[in-house]
């Protein structure tokens, strides 16, 4: 196909394995080290990439405190072969942070503000718990319900509004785990995972290159025994149908097509369009619907044109209404989260946007599809989406 010189392309995309956030494999590895590992991997895997030519490192991270504070993008970049002359910034759009990093790089290249960016994100939810240091303004309750900050309750509400029952959620959760486990067993994640040294359950140093959050024996019977965790009396959302707390990092090398040509690189995909949208905070999980609609409109596409989809599975009760209203529910078996999703792999907040883009590009290559969509919801009522066209 014919590309324009200023088209934005992805030349490589990688991630760490997703580790548990409680006594996990990365319990002795800091967030900066995980970030540095995936940044450096892009150069190790692509000899033609020149670290000194990076225009900026843009890194997503949500809870920017403790080891994730003070511009973790820069703190991680200086631990790689990227020279000190290359700047770095950390961005925060909660769950959508690292996808927003991609969008910023895309916009900058379109505007002529550079040609080559390293983007991605990280979250170490074991070292830096999700609620550590959070201090919400009490006055905000005059404008949004306090429960809107409780993601599980927003999923309960969205599920009830769309008539999503417990059995449907349980089946969705089991599917995620079973598909992720099959992908692990068959090596489908091998091309995207960068091995990082960590520790196994016995404390021995190991190269961690397999996702450890997946429930290998997930089944409907056991899933049905789990109790609701957010609304114990009348709820339907359980730990088995919620994204797991986890630890991980992911990174993409993004540049203009003319720069890729000059470097003799074959891009994986072109960034076709992007979208970001808001929705009511009480149903924050619905955000992917308007965000995807924006991205599709910008590209002049319809949802039926999209062949492969990665939807971040914050909750089954949230994902199912999104898929229904996007017209994807009946296409799940051949198009959506074919290697499972965040329910099985976990949702390390600042990492997830880049992670689902990375997995999407990997699945598109394996399935030999052309157009793909990565989209996710964002706490307090937002959604973000990116449409890709596979090039090789």
UniProtKB/Swiss-Prot annotation:
Its main location: cytoplasm. Keywords: Acyltransferase, Cytoplasm, Fatty acid metabolism, Lipid degradation, Lipid metabolism, Transferase. It is found in: Cytoplasm. One of its GO terms (biological process) is fatty acid beta-oxidation. It comes from the Bacteria. Transmembrane segments: none annotated. The active site is at residues 95, 347, 377. Pathway: Lipid metabolism; fatty acid beta-oxidation. Pfam families: Thiolase_C, Thiolase_N. It catalyses: an acyl-CoA + acetyl-CoA = a 3-oxoacyl-CoA + CoA. InterPro entries: FadA, Thiolase, Thiolase-like, Thiolase-like_sf_Thiolase, Thiolase_acyl_enz_int_AS, Thiolase_AS, Thiolase_C, Thiolase_CS. Its EC number is 2.3.1.16. NCBIfam families: AcCoA-C-Actrans, fadA, PRK08947.1. Belongs to the thiolase-like superfamily. Thiolase family. PANTHER family: 3-KETOACYL-COA THIOLASE FADA (PTHR43853:SF11), 3-KETOACYL-COA THIOLASE, PEROXISOMAL (PTHR43853). This is 3-ketoacyl-CoA thiolase. It comes from Chromohalobacter salexigens (strain ATCC BAA-138 / DSM 3043 / CIP 106854 / NCIMB 13768 / 1H11).
């Amino acid at each position: 196909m014919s590309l324009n010189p200023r088209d934005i392309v992805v030349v490589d995309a990688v991630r760490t394995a997703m580790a548990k956030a409680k006594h996990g494999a990365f319990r002795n590895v800091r967030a900066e080290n995980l970030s540095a590992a995936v940044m450096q991997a892009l150069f190790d895997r692509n000899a033609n990439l020149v670290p000194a030519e990076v225009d900026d490192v843009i890194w997503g991270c949500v809870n920017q405190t403790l080891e994730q504070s003070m511009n973790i993008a820069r703190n991680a970049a200086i631990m790689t072969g990227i020279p000190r002359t290359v700047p770095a910034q950390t961005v925060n759009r909660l769950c959508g942070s690292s996808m927003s990093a991609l969008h910023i790089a895309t916009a900058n290249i379109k505007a002529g503000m550079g040609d080559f960016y390293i983007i991605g994100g990280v979250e170490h939810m074991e070292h830096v718990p999700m609620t550590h240091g959070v201090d919400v303004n009490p006055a905000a309750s005059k404008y949004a319900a306090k429960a809107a900050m409780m993601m599980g309750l927003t999923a309960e509400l969205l599920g009830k509004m769309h008539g999503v029952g417990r059995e449907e959620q349980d089946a969705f959760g089991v599917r995620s785990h079973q598909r992720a486990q099959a992908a692990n067993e068959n090596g489908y994640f091998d091309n995207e995972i960068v091995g990082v040294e960590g520790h196994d359950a016995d404390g021995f140093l190991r190269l961690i290159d397999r996702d450890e959050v997946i429930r290998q024996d997930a089944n409907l019977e056991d899933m049905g025994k789990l109790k609701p965790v957010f609304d114990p009396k009348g709820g339907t959302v359980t730990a088995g149908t919620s994204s797991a707390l986890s630890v991980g990092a992911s990174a993409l090398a993004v540049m203009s097509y003319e720069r890729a040509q000059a470097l003799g690189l074959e891009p994986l995909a072109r960034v076709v369009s992007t979208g970001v949208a808001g929705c009511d905070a009480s149903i924050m999980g619905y955000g992917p619907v308007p965000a995807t609609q924006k991205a599709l409109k910008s590209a002049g596409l319809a949802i039926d044109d999209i062949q492969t989809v990665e939807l971040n599975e914050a909750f089954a009760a949230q994902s199912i209404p999104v898929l229904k209203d996007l017209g994807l529910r009946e296409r799940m078996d051949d198009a959506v989260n074919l290697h499972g999703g965040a329910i099985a792999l976990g949702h390390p907040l600042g990492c997830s946007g880049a992670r689902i883009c990375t997995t999407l590009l990997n699945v598109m290559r394996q399935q030999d599809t052309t157009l793909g969509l990565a989209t996710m919801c964002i706490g307090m009522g937002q959604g973000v989406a990116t449409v890709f066209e596979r090039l090789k």
